[in-house]
Swiss-Prot record:
It is found in: Endoplasmic reticulum membrane. The keyword Transferase applies. One of its GO terms (cellular component) is endoplasmic reticulum membrane. Keywords: ATP-binding, Endoplasmic reticulum, Kinase, Membrane, Nucleotide-binding, Signal-anchor, Transferase, Transmembrane, Transmembrane helix. InterPro entries: Kinase-like_dom_sf, POMK, Prot_kinase_dom, Ser-Thr/Tyr_kinase_cat_dom. It catalyses: 3-O-[beta-D-GalNAc-(1->3)-beta-D-GlcNAc-(1->4)-alpha-D-Man]-L-Thr-[protein] + ATP = 3-O-[beta-D-GalNAc-(1->3)-beta-D-GlcNAc-(1->4)-(O-6-P-alpha-D-Man)]-Thr-[protein] + ADP + H(+). The gene is pomk. Residues 1-14 are cytoplasmic. It is a single-pass type II membrane protein. Pfam families: PK_Tyr_Ser-Thr (PF07714). It is an enzyme of class 2 (transferase). Gene3D superfamilies: Transferase(Phosphotransferase) domain 1. This is Protein O-mannose kinase. It comes from Danio rerio (Zebrafish).
Length: 347
């Protein structure tokens, strides 16, 4: 009986350090989690090659220094085609290799689309920034240009990419909301760009709109297809996206034929419009980018008011892209602060 009592005392004395050890381990785990999340999301705008290189220079892949844009002789002799990875009406795109770096070689598909091809190239040159794919080289004589290669392809692959084991940890509201911010940031840049006020015309449906953007391996959104960006001239009559009638709910109301079924569509009679057509489409693109991720419903709740403003039928009543961007960033910061506070409360 005495031995049992002694054993019980010893068990209590030995159990106290074990409990303290467990509490200490839990505390350390929470601290590590806090610093991990803080480090992971504290910088939502990492530096890009555009900000690291002077104008008309590039740095891609494993390059340690910037190089001038490649010219015709360098492209002809140094860029080797590997395989066809994309094809549209305007151009074909080949995975290619240059000095051990993977690049994308774009080649004019047909002479009848030469104007569109050259327009896209001029926009790619003029809009080089953190919002746009990196230009590597140009040879107008051969109707080709070279850009940085992004293996994940267009942002249409987002859901399947984030379902892969290597990217599954990135399938969070942080990643997806940042992609939406990237999209709106590009529109804000496009609407006040060095090349004037530009409108995304290759955006008549959701699939077409998303196909204009690449998904980078670091889960950033980059504008890639710039073949249809007409300029809105101040005091002008606006722009028209193509010469055919547009239909559907995705396009803005002002892009629809306004004179009813009693009058046949006429390109000459169709009124022009401006960059506010891009604003109308922001909520639909955002819903795709957010998907069904945990926390997405909270984000949609916070964005409900700006969604409503973007969907105003009167184009002039819609917010600017910069105003939408400000709201999106505010929601991101608010969500991050709430998450950080929850982690701090656990400590």
């Amino acid at each position: 009986m005495g031995g049992t009592a002694v054993g019980g005392v010893i068990g209590v004395r030995c159990g106290v350090p074990a409990v303290l050890l467990c509490l200490g381990a839990l505390l350390c785990a929470n601290v590590l989690l806090y610093f991990y999340l803080d480090a992971l999301y504290q910088n939502t705008n990492p530096p890009s090659a555009h900000t690291q290189c002077p104008p008309r220079h590039f740095k891609v892949g494993t390059m340690s220094s910037c190089s001038p844009w490649l010219k015709c002789p360098e492209i002809r002799s140094g860029v080797r085609r590997v395989k066809l990875i994309g094809q549209g009406a305007v151009k074909k795109v080949y995975l290619s290799e240059w000095q051990g770096q993977k690049v994308a070689l774009s080649v004019l598909s047909s002479d009848q689309y030469a104007d569109d091809f050259l327009h896209g190239l001029s926009m790619l040159r003029a809009l080089q920034s953190s919002h746009v794919v990196t230009l590597v080289g140009v040879c107008e004589e051969d109707a080709v240009f070279v850009t940085e290669y992004h293996p994940l392809g267009s942002v249409l692959t987002l859901d399947t990419t984030l379902a892969q084991e290597r990217y599954r940890w990135r399938n969070s509201w942080h990643t997806r909301l940042q992609l939406a911010i990237d999209y709106v940031a590009f529109l804000a840049y496009l609407h006040s760009s060095p090349a004037g006020i530009r409108v995304m015309c290759d955006s008549n449906d959701l699939h077409k709109t998303l196909s204009q953007f690449l998904l980078a391996s670091d889960m950033r959104l980059l504008a890639n297809d710039l073949d249809a960006l007409p300029e809105v001239e101040k005091g002008g009559l606006g722009v028209k996206c193509g010469h055919h009638e547009l239909t559907g709910d995705f396009v803005a109301p002002e892009q629809l034929w306004p004179y009813g079924e009693d009058f046949s569509f006429s390109d000459e009679a169709m009124p022009g419009y401006d960059e506010k057509t891009d604003i109308w489409k922001i909520p639909d693109v955002t819903r795709f980018l957010l998907g069904d991720v945990l926390g997405g419903d909270v984000i949609h709740f916070h964005l409900f008011q700006i969604y409503s403003e973007c969907k105003r039928k009167e184009a002039h009543m819609r917010p600017t892209a910069r105003e939408v961007l400000s709201v999106y960033r505010s929601v991101y910061d608010s969500m991050m602060e709430s998450q950080s506070q929850r982690v701090r409360d656990m400590l």
